[in-house]
Amino acid sequence: MNTSMSVPPLGYGFHLTNTPLPPLQEVLENLFTVEIPMTVTFRGVNSRQSALICGPHGCGEFAPFLEYGAQESAAWLACALEAAWLPTPKPVRTRIPLNATLPAVPAERVPEVLAKYEGEIQELKIKVAEKGQSLADDIARVAAARDALPNARLKVDANMGYTLAGALDALRKLCEYGIIYAEQPVASIEDMAALRFAIAKEGLPARIAADESIRKAEDPLKVARANAADLMVIKAAPLGGVRRALALVEQAQLPAVVSSALESSVGIATGASLAASLPTLRYGCGLGTVSLMAEDVTDEPLIARDGFMDLRAITPSPQRLERLATDEQTRQWWVERVTACYRVLERACGL
């Protein structure tokens, strides 16, 4: 266990490049608020609101979920400002391997959802442990996915939905369908470590990936110190930007896979920049979620084709921004939210 790891500060990208935060007024003058309808219910939402912020190096996306407070959401703002005001790090690769994402739909809807993805699906992340559903629902969904994709790599994401005993029972059954890893099956780091030990003892092939234990933790490196995961799932926005996420991966010394926070192509481009900058990338990234949206802010969405996404910049379309714009009351709510998060970020940067 490496006990010398230390968490980089919020606003790390600006610290690292010795760049001041852009003035708040400039940020607000270049802010566009949108609401994008979705084709399926995902994490209980049918549409996605966000604020796009444009600067000298492009646009960033500020899209913390509506229930998040300023303290948690400030990392998302740091990411958006870094994307808009700082150059992207030099990439290691220009094509990103992706997984498709299957929401917790009934088994009979699996072929319909998978048909929305272009080309061959080589890796699929399946949502399980949804509130109000049963393990039988999870098994049926995974079985339907395996029937539809006999050669694809499958992985499941429980979003902390199982108990320790329930997770072990679920993995015994789900491993029959050849899943390669389970993402955040339980809530606590202690239970993650116990589950990892238990499945190794039973010889189950699935690995354990940490998501919420990293992106929602005050100390995102605690899971690595506790040897509670085989790999880490990282998201640029909740971790405060590409540079801070890369620093966390370097310190944790765990394989990493990048996932989206359900953003438009603007936010996905930031996630792709993070994936492109990782020293190694063993698994497909969860950046194919634009396919779950009925619209996008650009004429050329960042979507997967045959399991890969090309690294490229995204320019929002003025016509789409106008069509997807929120009403003025909602826009003002986002302005106030950005302002509150900016104050948190300002303090973190010592300004």
Q: Which role fits each region the language model picked out?
A:
Residues 2-32, 36-48, 59-64, 83-86, ...:
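Flexible C-terminal active-site loop/helix
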Residues 34, 60-62, 94-102, 122-126, ...:
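Hydrophobic faces of well-ordered beta-strands that scaffold small-molecule active sites
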Residues 61-71, 122-139:
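Glycine-rich, proline-tolerant flexible connector loops at the mouths of alpha/beta enzymes
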Residues 84-87, 100-116, 131-132, 139-144:
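Short, charged beta->alpha transition segments
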Residues 131-270, 275, 295-297, 302:
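Catalytic core of soluble alpha/beta enzymes
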